[in-house]
Amino acid sequence: MASSRLPASALTLKQFIQRQKVLSLYRNMMRTIRQVPDEGDRKYLRDWARDEFKRNKNSTNQDAIRMMITQANMHHDELQSSLALANVKK
């Protein structure tokens, strides 16, 4: 009998793609947060984002993860819009 070469903990293709989306979103969020001019606000947002991602790190429900990705994208877009408006008003 041939056994699989993949370890039992290997991700499925869907899980792998979803993981890449989450990592990309996290990196984009951190890049956007770096643009926040006030150091205190920047630290607060960075800590908030890290805590949110860390809190949901062990989620396995695909639908819940998709919903969290959608919410995080909305927060990211809102932050980018706020930064754009703040730069226009200067």
UniProtKB/Swiss-Prot annotation:
Coiled coil: none
InterPro entries: Complex1_LYR_dom, Complex1_LYR_LYRM2
Chief localisation class: mitochondrion
Compartments where found: Mitochondrion
Disulphide-bridged cysteine pairs: none
Pfam families: Complex1_LYR
Single GO BP term: mitochondrial respiratory chain complex I assembly
Keyword Hydrolase included in the entry's annotation: no
Keyword annotations from UniProtKB, A to Z: Mitochondrion, Transit peptide
Transit peptide: 1-19
GO cellular component: mitochondrion
UniProt entry tagged with the keyword NADP: no
Protein task: Involved in efficient integration of the N-module into mitochondrial respiratory chain complex I.
Family: Belongs to the complex I LYR family.
Protein name: LYR motif-containing protein 2
Gene source species: Salmo salar (Atlantic salmon)
